[in-house]
Amino acid sequence: MASLFVSTPSSSLTLKSCHSLHLRRFDRAEFSNFGKASVNQTTRSRHSLRCSAEDDRVREPVNEAPSPVALAEEQKEDHDNNNAPPSPESSEEEEEKKSKQQEMDWKTDEEFKKFMGNPSIEAAIKLEKTRTDRKLKELNKESNSENPIIGIYNSLARDSLTKEKERLEKAEETFKALDLNKLKSCFGFDTFFATDVRRFGDGGIFIGNLRKPIDEVTPKLEAKLSEAAGRDVVVWFMEERSNEITKQVCMVQPKAEIDLQFESTRLSTPWGYVSAIALCVTTFGTIALMSGFFLKPDATFDDYIANVVPLFGGFLSILGVSEIATRVTAARHGVKLSPSFLVPSNWTGCLGVMNNYESLLPNKKALFDIPVARTASAYLTSLLLAAAAFISDGSFNGGDNALYIRPQFFDNNPLLSFVQFVVGPYADDLGNVLPNAVEGVGVPVDPLAFAGLLGMVVTSLNLLPCGRLEGGRIAQAMFGRSTAAILSFTTSLLLGIGGLSGSVLCLAWGLFATFFRGGEETPAKDEITPVGDDRFAWGIVLGLICFLTLFPNSGGTFSTSFFNGPFFRGDDF
């Protein structure tokens, strides 16, 4: 159903007129099994479904004066044909042959293939009804079988197909295509002036231009369209680029179909909440496991608890603050969110929080504000935790319950630049090792400060402009869908190159971002109004922080001492 929102000229039926906003209805009886779309199979067999000046011209037949004898013979034949009643068996066979031949014609028809690239729910339901009716007819022919087992099987199958047909009939009443002839009268000079229209799914795309601000047009136009359609509809305003010309379009779709799409992908279910709780417990376990990697070799269980509790507290503070900020911002914009799913990792303990949008976004500002609320609050909380820990310890040496960061942890990973900037190198230019560095163990860092440092790195990973990560959502709001798709592909490619170069984190995060958070968000109802200069500036600032935090700096922040491997007191220089 994702294709329901993307307006591509190649996947929809283009309906144009040279003189006015004109629609042609295709509702001949022989094509009723295939929904709205049909093809005129007269002398213009399977012609392009396009309203144009050529279609509007009337092709008059050649008038020839028939002879009286020929006219009398034709009248006699017509009279005989009308008086001869067709047999029921022959009519059923002819209808079945006609239906099969018609389906074969549709399979070979190029215009039908284009239409099925953007099928409507109504057309799909009618196609299923046709197949169900055909199966019922086949079962009725086999109902006289003498085998009792086959008879029972046919009876059960017939009951099942009958229920299926009733269900499809009810669904057909719900999902009917909108009558674009009625809808076109709702557009005008005071809302959105439509100059062209084409069918898209069970709704349509009206091409034209806005005459007033979108905030004024949207409620007024939705009310008029819903009244004309006899049911609720949803309206989007977008920009469509064709032949290097940008046009404003208004897309109209039945609200029932949009609700069905969100219902099919909804995660606010019992299983969704169970999965969220399971991932939360798993993430707490990976945080506890990761904490043990940085203890002293002779650490006791009390030392472990003393180190793990601050790290847990730091992570929970970052996650809690960012989650509250995200929920409050989403509620302010009227957007429903799914349960939040933690991403466990045995490298950083947690790789962030994921959730989906379960309702339509009102505009690009909402698409921008919600991910920015999460990432900005996580950055600020992480920075405050690190600063508070360093201030309380009075130094950068970790205090009494320090975690010891091993040298291998600094090699070729995203923590390198920022952690080195905060705690300093293992040795300065003169070879003097930090006073509290432990030979063979690492540099001591306060657990609460380390939670803040990890929080900044994890937030930066989620700010990468890829798919439906927070950074991908921000890029889509700032630059549009096409540019965001290019950035997403480039980011996935760079992560793949990093993974092939030996970085397990790049490989794992690249696979996760591409396959689990790939794609793009549902378009906002207002895709025309930009986010504004202030939001654009904030997006650039967040992008710079992400870049500076994750930039692969193999030489370290202190270039002269970190070109060589880390070393400790007692090593030969």
Curated annotation (Swiss-Prot):
Query: Can you tell me which residues the record assigns to a coiled coil?
Result: 122-185
Keyword check for Protease:
yes
Q: Relate the protein's function as given in its record.
A: Probable membrane-associated metalloprotease that may be involved in chloroplast development.
Instruction: Name a GO molecular-function annotation.
Output: metallopeptidase activity
Its record classes its membrane topology as: Multi-pass membrane protein
Segments for region (Disordered): 38-105
Please give the InterPro entries that the UniProt record associates with this protein: EGY1-like
Q: Compositionally biased, Basic and acidic residues: which spans?
A: 52-62, 96-105
Q: What is the top-level taxon of the source organism?
A: Eukaryota
Its subcellular locations are: Plastid, Chloroplast membrane
- Name of the top EC class for this enzyme: hydrolase
Residue span of the annotated presequence: 1-50
Q: Where is the chain membrane-spanning? A: 274-294, 305-325, 376-396, 414-434, 441-461, 493-513, 536-556
Q: Its family? A: Belongs to the peptidase M50B family.
Q: What keywords sit in the KW lines?
A: Chloroplast, Coiled coil, Hydrolase, Membrane, Metalloprotease, Plastid, Protease, Transit peptide, Transmembrane, Transmembrane helix
What's the source species for this entry?
Arabidopsis thaliana
**Name of the protein in its database record:** Probable zinc metallopeptidase EGY3, chloroplastic
GO BP terms: proteolysis; response to salt stress
> Under the cellular component aspect of Gene Ontology, which terms does the record hold?
chloroplast membrane
Q: What Enzyme Commission number does this protein have?
A: 3.4.24.-
